[in-house]
Regions:
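Short, well-ordered beta-to-alpha junction loops that form the rim of enzyme active sites
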Residues: 16, 34-35, 123-125
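Catalytic core of nucleotide-sugar-dependent glycosyltransferases
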Residues: 27, 34-43, 48-73, 93-110
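Acidic donor-binding loop at a coil-to-helix junction in glycosyltransferase catalytic cores
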Residues: 11-18
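Short clusters of hydrophobic/aromatic residues that line enzyme substrate/ligand-binding pockets
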Residues: 6, 10, 46-48, 159
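Hydrophobic, well-ordered beta-alpha structural blocks that scaffold small-molecule cofactor pockets
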Residues: 73, 77-210
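A contiguous binding-surface segment within folded domains or other stable secondary-structure elements
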Residues: 11, 25, 31
Length: 210
């Protein structure tokens, strides 16, 4: 099988597009447990100087190969959820594509836009702190799975367990504030507790960056 050359239509993400064509033809790409190539990011690298263009190209490429990507990530819901959040932020996803994501990870139906109302931050870590700095007095308290954090203060706000949060919560929105690769597991945790609506910190921070 002939894969062909780099596709100049995908300038900025041509490596990714080439790998996906390889996977389309041969199924998988195996790894070699050696460092054969190092990729450096610096202030004048393409990834930094043309970030917006790279994101646009990346999403064009993802849309072209979306069925392959969904198939490969079907058993990796954390990665698939992160991909969904990134794509949803940068482009208007077609309704039929949203349904494809929902069929694999139905919990994403619970993601809603932050409503500029009182909130609870689920995740008393770096991203939680960043989110609190943006929302300030709108944040009532934090929630975390780490028992060692319960009862302590973060930004002068208490850190509670999930059980305590459920007892004290009124109509506050819950904001999941963890790395994008862990959002899905937090969503599942809330879903099982009967909380079916939540916001994602990444979307809030992206909004306030504008």
């Amino acid at each position: 099988d002939e894969i062909g050359l780099y596709n100049t239509d995908f300038f900025g993400v041509e490596d990714y597009e080439y790998w996906l064509r390889i996977m389309t033809h041969f199924g998988d790409i195996l790894s070699v447990d050696q460092t054969l190539y190092q990729y450096r990011r610096h202030s004048v690298s393409l990834s930094e100087t043309r970030r917006k263009m790279v994101h646009q190209q990346l999403n064009r490429m993802r849309l072209q190969f979306i069925d392959l990507i969904l198939d490969k990530l079907r058993d990796k819901p954390n990665e698939l959820c992160g991909l969904y959040i990134e794509m949803k932020h940068t482009i208007a996803l077609p309704s039929e594509l949203i349904k494809k994501f929902e069929q694999i990870i139905p919990e994403i139906r619970g993601i809603e836009c932050y409503r500029d109302e009182p909130a609870i931050i689920f995740g008393a870590g770096t991203l939680g702190i960043q989110t609190e700095k943006v929302l300030k007095e709108k944040v009532h308290f934090f929630v975390d799975n780490d028992k060692e954090k319960w009862g302590h203060l973060l930004a002068n706000k208490g850190i509670l367990s999930l059980d305590e949060m459920l007892r004290r919560r009124k109509s506050d929105q819950i904001i999941i504030a963890v790395g994008i690769d862990r959002v899905y597991e937090m969503m599942v945790q809330l879903w099982r507790l009967g909380v079916h609506k939540f916001s994602v910190a990444q979307e809030i921070l992206w909004l306030y960056e504008k």
